């Protein structure tokens, strides 16, 4: 039996919202009207776009925060969008279900499809560009696509170095016996890739399911797995000065120096899964998670800022005036 067969049914972040395909995926997006309640619907990420903010979520919803107001903008998709990233003030990408990638060249005002495939049946969970043309999108079951032309074309990659040793041997044996079955099995053996970040020294850090933390010093061409003694899912990662934090299931948060070899667990006063993180210019670190939890972190000490019952918080961002915004299962909000 391979390690992948032992996976639990735990979904990341806010559970099924991220991994189930929308019932409306077969609808024509041109027939879907702007939703008046989009700001209070499921939203899964927020990103800064110059002086503005852009939030993404269910049914292809994209909201733009401009002139201190949130306004929904039209998009060409109605699949769930899980992550949004801006390389500069104008150029941004959002990813989501059905291997969807959409692109904006005007700060989030308008969007076009760069990639989408219902045949892939996997969601992208993150996207990262390290130049105007070069970027990577990652997602469930090892989904990994690369572009070298700003997203005009995307190429699939399989990173065997991130498999368990047992699975590598299993695939090698299977490939010699049945090529079709080999390709089918290969598509489901890698863990979910949940977050990809670029460190200050230009290395890429990838975190995901089954305690996967991996680092690359060649822009994601190859990765080296990092062993930090935990086998639960990691949902996010962030750099704070000379420290790296990874976070995930049931309130598990770990901190290391830049060597990624000296990990300490950060004791949280909660067991809620941690989904999102933000570091300010003053190196203040905030974490958000399930059960409406918002935490501030000082080195390895954690303090609860608030707990909002009945909702899950997935993302946090700061606007141009320094105000914090949160996104999650009940949409966008600020703390009073």
Where do the model's predicted regions map?
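Bacterial N-terminal signal peptides that target proteins for export
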Residues: 1-10
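Hydrophobic helical h-region of N-terminal Sec-dependent signal peptides
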Residues: 11-15
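N-terminal signal peptide c-region/cleavage motif recognized by signal peptidases
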Residues: 20-22
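Residue-level hotspots at or immediately adjacent to binding/recognition sites across diverse folds
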Residues: 25-336
